[in-house]
């Protein structure tokens, strides 16, 4: 879709974590070498989320994207809260910002310019459908979680 449009981004901005793999694929497909990421926490589980999305450090330095044509990439536009936060941040600094997602839900606040499919259902992606293989222990490094044979 993006490749067949007249939009030629100078920067691909992937939203971590769900948008990292689609952003990398998009960067290769469009031959864009400048790839950045922005970590945003919003979802804490299946259909569980914080009240508002929060940008996590390290924050993207606006000087790195100043004046650029940016394509923001994520896996899904569910409520659109994450994309709105990132798009609003970019809009203050860049020449143009557009969004690309694999899936867009009808309730999304942001209507993305590039959408592979639209759905009202929960989407499970291969990179996020399984539980983490490590657990966080307070004050310690990550500890491996035993993987059962039924995974």
PLM regions: where:
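PRPP-associated nucleotide enzymes
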Residues: 1-151
